[in-house]
């Protein structure tokens, strides 16, 4: 389908769009006039990570095409915990932890958006904290069918595996649905956007609005951020790829995108840069060693959007100093049998096997002191399990640096 509205057309062409309720009607509306859309973020950590970057980029495009945005921070729903995609309940956070996380997430989002340009920051604690239980059950709870709620993926997956699902988590969909209704009442919000795992919650919010007599509401989801093999992206030997510079520094952020698999380059250029599509097509079609130039462009452009142009250029220059003046081809090779990474091998164990450290405990001490890098990225988790995926995305090998002088190329062999 070819959309009339610039926003929806961009989402489709660049590969964000997963599902949309009544896309024809929403397209007509967005082509006719600016609308107000919202995206919600629960305050479960001090920063967002690249799993949320899809939604952040979508917000940038909402601004670009003149639409208004409500950024909803889940000061209230964080106390409950969204069960979507989770095998067990989240740990309960204190009020102070939620407040600190809220401040950190807001600071992260502020880096990506032009503040004051049609952006409203809301916190659902404002209205959920005022809810009277019996009135909520009468007005909102009566509009939900337990039969239908049991069919939600977030619920069914836990029950099918005989995993505990508390009533607290089971109630989450009611609260998210109520958020949509409340945001329409307060800000005339007509569109909710979220990841693909939020589809059930979004549709329930639309249905609640209909039952309460609100005008037509819409929902839209983006694809989850997965690799070409279906694994979640955003995990490294350094942990999650956070968008906060203190939690994941710009140099590591640059290296993360520089080290993606060749097959991912075009897709990530479309998603996480704002380069014109014709330029992306040229970069995507590079072959052999030339694809590394496209990876550098991806890394620099993505880092500039997240951390600023100067930080991106500094990260690029630092990487060039390491890699282009210390060619991988000249590094000593260490063969690693593929059976050792079938179940994953810890970084500390690899350092011992490769002779870079005398023992696993020595490797742990080195990593604790931030003295080890894999593919240019500082390793902080000594127990991170390196698997085939880590090697496959870098043509079957990784480079390991310990301090300034001990450098090897670890190659997987049969």
Swiss-Prot record:
One of its GO terms (cellular component) is cytosol. This is Tyrosine--tRNA ligase. Homodimer. InterPro entries: aa-tRNA-synth_Ic, Rossmann-like_a/b/a_fold, S4_RNA-bd_sf, Tyr-tRNA-ligase, Tyr-tRNA-ligase_bac-type, Tyr-tRNA-ligase_bac_1. L-tyrosine binds at residues 38, 172, 176. It comes from the Bacteria. ATP binds at residue 235. It is found in: Cytoplasm. Residues 345-412 form the S4 RNA-binding domain. Its EC number is 6.1.1.1. A motif ('KMSKS' region) lies at residues 232-236. The keyword Electron transport does not apply. It is an enzyme of class 6 (ligase). Catalyzes the attachment of tyrosine to tRNA(Tyr) in a two-step reaction: tyrosine is first activated by ATP to form Tyr-AMP and then transferred to the acceptor end of tRNA(Tyr). GO terms for biological process: tyrosyl-tRNA aminoacylation. A motif ('HIGH' region) lies at residues 43-52. Keywords: Aminoacyl-tRNA synthetase, ATP-binding, Cytoplasm, Ligase, Nucleotide-binding, Protein biosynthesis, RNA-binding. One of its GO terms (molecular function) is RNA binding. Belongs to the class-I aminoacyl-tRNA synthetase family. TyrS type 1 subfamily.
